[in-house]
Amino acid sequence: MSGISLSSYRRVTVKIGSALLVDRAAGLKREWLAALVDDIARLMSAGTEVLVVSSGAIALGRTVLGLGKRTLRLEESQAAAAVGQIALAGAWSGELGRHGLISGQVLVTLGDTEERRRYLNARATISTLLKMKAVPVINENDTVATSEIRYGDNDRLAARVATMMGGDLLILLSDVDGLYTAPPERDPAAKFIPVVDAITPEIMAMGGAAASELSRGGMRTKLDAGRIATAAGTAMIIASGKERGPLSAIERGARATLFKPSPTPVRAYKTWIAGQLEPAGRIGIDDGALRALLQGKSLLPAGVRRVEGVFSRGDTVAIVDSAGREIGRGLVAYDAADAVKIAGLKTGDIAGILGYEARAAMVHRDDLVLSGPTGELMDRKVEGIDVAGA
């Protein structure tokens, strides 16, 4: 793959994996970080805005605290994160300061990108940092996040940040140098894929486990991140960060996989809906409702066959077809209890069941994003309708 001019992008989000930044015995890899910051400073001097999503708080904290390799309890992980976050923020501040740059730490939880009001507030804060020429250094707030309310990996967090901020490139740096047809450590015949035009089910199937002990992510989470990013019009690169100056290495043509952005990205409001990581519930629809959605119509109760989960009006729900495949997400107009009551009913019968005059649509088309497992419309046909071309 020929070199990519990173300075040709307007706003770049760089995600750094824990294993790149932290050595279990020695702690923070300061020389590696210094070389990366040199790259960042060079990009910024060329006019490119840079956001950093930095893993490593727990890994660094457990090294500082001498917690070893054993599996940590939740409270131990959170304590390690508390120690690691301070050390990590100080390291970023010091290295960026060598170039006269200011860093701003932003710690987020799942709710900061999944709840609309907090999403807008987080976006405004980071936008202000960028306007002030500061470098946002973003991480999940592992001191308060629990397994039930967390991203679970910084790949998807980075994709949410990149799309939230309208970035045009996301770079995932880790200990893998791109996408292969199979995990190369297990299959010597695995072939490297330099460019991905669209994240199809076949591409998703290539996502084997590629996580190291110090990181939580693997190739599957990187492909999940790619679905979020590319659907919103953000290109993505998966590259190895093992070499010092990894961004310069990408520009020199080091092995990396480029995921092209969708040619028809969804607008900002729908980007937020489509990128929701944890839908509150699922609504199963019949083929007639699917045809209507593909024609740009709203989802009416008559086409709903099942309702799963506990959700409130305004929550994001996944919409699945008769085979159980997710074909879209949207903001539901009813809470779960009422949705169950009116599933399958004609619009004129709803008021008699609920006892009040209600909305005609279960999910209005303005609050709906069609997206298959690939982040694009599904490549299949439903009774003569070409979903891929709809």
Curated annotation (Swiss-Prot):
Pathway(s) annotated for this protein in UniProt: Amino-acid biosynthesis; L-proline biosynthesis; L-glutamate 5-semialdehyde from L-glutamate: step 1/2
CDD domains: AAK_G5K_ProB (cd04242), PUA_G5K (cd21157)
GO function terms (MF aspect): ATP binding; glutamate 5-kinase activity; RNA binding
Locations listed in the record: Cytoplasm
SUPFAM superfamilies: Carbamate kinase-like, PUA domain-like
Cysteine disulfide links: none
A Pfam match: AA_kinase
Catalytic activity: L-glutamate + ATP = L-glutamyl 5-phosphate + ADP
PUA domain sequence ranges: 280-357
Binding site residues for ATP: 15, 174-175
GO biological process: L-proline biosynthetic process
InterPro entries: AceGlu_kinase-like_sf, Asp/Glu/Uridylate_kinase, G5K_ProB, Glu/AcGlu_kinase, Glu_5kinase, Glu_5kinase/COase_Synthase, Glutamate_5-kinase_CS, PUA
EC nos: 2.7.2.11
GO cellular component, one term: cytosol
Keyword Ribosomal protein: no
Binding positions (substrate): 55, 142, 154
Keywords assigned: Amino-acid biosynthesis, ATP-binding, Cytoplasm, Kinase, Nucleotide-binding, Proline biosynthesis, Transferase
Protein function: Catalyzes the transfer of a phosphate group to glutamate to form L-glutamate 5-phosphate.
Family: Belongs to the glutamate 5-kinase family.
The protein's name: Glutamate 5-kinase
Species per Swiss-Prot/TrEMBL record: Chelativorans sp. (strain BNC1)
Gene: proB
